[in-house]
Amino acid sequence: MAECGHGYRSQRWEAENWIGHRYPFKVMSFVELQAQYIREGRLNLDPTRNQKRVTFHDPCNQARNGGIVEEPRYILRNTVMDFVEMEPHGAENYCCGGGGGMLSMTEFASERKAAGKAKADQILATGAEIVATSCHNCLDQLDEVKRHYKLKVKIQNLSELVANAIVWPKPPESEESSQEAEEKK
């Protein structure tokens, strides 16, 4: 199970080379698992809990390399009221500029900010109030792009929107609680 695009890529395609044998299981992205749980009805969701307009930034390692394009959109269609696509999107979406280790190299901050201009323009064109993504490197880079270009958006992990939409079942009332309620009447 991998949360971010970079973790997914390293676990899905590279780790078996390092450990010298194939995994006896399928490596999944957390996005794939969330979509699976929604399809199976294992999550009770209320999209009205996410009213603001949301757009999605496709992490390069998930969309381009992993083909994980429909899953985040399926999740958003089930967790938010107003989802709008960036153009282009999916495997053609613009890179945020934070991948390839660039985010951790402060000496390349100006290059990252310059690369983020296309992403800032892309975000603005959607009119979204929230930019969701499913990679922590992208999350940090998009937050930096937001600050640098003074974008009036909130950057959130896709999982935060899922968590906000979950309708948790009420715990069963204990027999003692039922008796106490009756006594108070």
Segments from the language model and where they lie:
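Iron-sulfur cluster-binding electron-transfer modules in prokaryotic oxidoreductases
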Residues: M1-K185
